[in-house]
A protein has these predicted regions:
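Hydrophobic beta-strand segment of the Class I
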Residues: 306-307
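Nucleic-acid modification enzymes, centered on SAM-dependent nucleic-acid methyltransferases
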Residues: 1-299, 318-345, 352, 359, ...
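Short glycine-dipeptide loop
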Residues: 331, 367-373
């Protein structure tokens, strides 16, 4: 039922060859740099023209002692070696408190896409990483940077743009999601504008090329284009290490990062080019359904083999995570049919078991007699394992083989099921 997953599968199977894809990406990136490159122009420490690689933003905090504002980056972190401090000494009153006792500063701004005033966390750009003539550099944000960013913040949204509401569930946190109700609020104004214009730019290409370029954008989007991009501190590192969004959640750190989207696209395109190359010599027909597996379209006894990787109970709310990409497609996953345990959707373990049973029953129906299904599953809770076991046994399938394979420290259990 996943809209993003179905779109990705359909697009990779659209018979575009690797050379066509590479030519399209090269042309797309060239056009994007010509039309949007000015959004990331900056100057190095000597005043020479350069390009932004990324900018660290910092939450502004409120001192619990004197109620004055201070920068988390300036007062709660250190460089060379990098560390996040457990305490902060207020630069105004000199009092020291645990970092967690400093509340975030808030600001009222007019959201011109929503056409109303909103309250959000106050964040400020603090450190710029750039490149000039192939040489990388970094420096503190200066007044010229602040003027440019303020100007971008005050720009109107595109006339054709519309608000796209976030449907919150288990992942919403009152702290770091404060003021985020719509898609555009997950981005800096600059990166949302660039992403919107890039999306519009894809519409100049034929359908199969357009969708390939859109998939490229979406593969980079939630991990690297939003405020969920972050920096981390590694032991004895001289500077912060840039990393993408934390997987499986919609976490925004106290030090979100604004990355230059244009720089990442060409690098991100390489695995897609390789995938198209691998598929060039494939024969046969591939049919992709964006529908629930509780009611399959395949005929009874028509399938030789099934592979499935069902949601692991309450482990990850996939539809909630994927909406950051799916909202760009103007179509999101139907959560009513999502097989997970979810208090926000009022789905219990019993509901999960019942829906999973229906899927396994359908697998049993479409499989040929004495043919197999492989299932990958993991759960850390006994009640979820019990639900999974009952779903299999009640479906007409039987377990004929199991194996355990560790993945990132978690046991993954592939099961071989046979239709009997």
């Amino acid at each position: 039922i996943g809209v993003y997953g179905s779109f990705a599968a359909k697009t990779l199977a659209n018979r575009l060859n690797a050379k066509e894809f590479r030519c399209a990406v090269d042309n797309f990136v060239q056009q994007a740099e010509m039309e949007l490159g000015q959004y990331y122009k900056t100057k190095d420490v000597k005043g020479n023209e350069g390009v932004v690689r990324h900018i660290i933003l910092s939450e502004v905090l409120i001192c619990p002692e004197c109620d004055k504002e201070l920068s988390y980056f300036e007062n709660g972190t250190k460089r060379n070696p990098v560390q996040f401090t457990k305490t902060i000494t207020c630069p105004h009153c000199g009092k020291t408190h645990d970092t967690d006792t400093f509340k975030p500063a808030l600001e009222n701004i007019y959201d011109s896409l929503l056409k109303k005033e909103i309250v959000r966390k106050k964040r400020e750009p603090v450190w710029v990483y750039g490149t000039t003539n192939g040489k990388n550099w970094d420096r503190k944000v200066n007044d010229e940077d602040r003027v440019l960013i303020k100007m971008l913040e005050e720009q109107e949204f595109e006339e054709s743009d519309i608000p796209r509401e976030i449907c919150w569930g288990e992942l919403h946190r009152t702290g770091y999601h404060l003021g985020i109700t719509h898609l555009h609020q997950f981005y800096t104004k600059r990166n949302y504008t660039v992403m919107f214009k890039l999306w519009k730019l894809t519409e100049r290409y034929p359908n199969n090329v357009r969708e390939a370029l859109q998939l490229l954008l979406l593969s980079y989007n939630s991990t690297h284009c939003t405020l969920m991009t972050r920096v981390v501190a590694k032991r004895n590192a001289k500077d912060f290490v840039l990393t993408g969004a934390q997987s499986g959640v919609l976490y925004i750190s106290k030090l979100p990062v604004e990355k230059n989207i244009l720089l990442g696209l060409k690098r991100k395109s390489i695995p897609f080019e390789e995938a198209y190359g691998l598929l060039e010599k494939c024969t046969g027909e591939l049919i992709i359904h964006n529908s629930s597996s509780e009611k399959m379209l395949e005929k009874t006894g028509s399938i030789d083999f099934v592979f499935t990787d069902p949601p692991f109970g309450d482990f990850i709310p996939y539809a909630e995570v994927n909406q950051i990409n799916e909202l760009w497609l103007n179509h999101t996953t139907d959560r009513e049919k999502e097989i997970i345990i979810s208090p926000s959707q009022e789905k219990s373990v019993a509901d999960y078991q019942w829906m999973l049973t229906r899927v396994f029953t359908e697998i049993s129906r479409v499989l040929k007699p004495d043919h197999y299904a492989a299932v990958v599953f993991h759960a850390a809770k006994a009640k979820i394992w019990e639900a999974f076991e009952h779903a299999i046994l009640d479906s007409g399938l039987a377990v004929c083989m199991t194996s355990i394979q560790g993945m990132r420290g978690l046991p993954i259990i592939p099961l071989s099921l046979i239709h009997i």
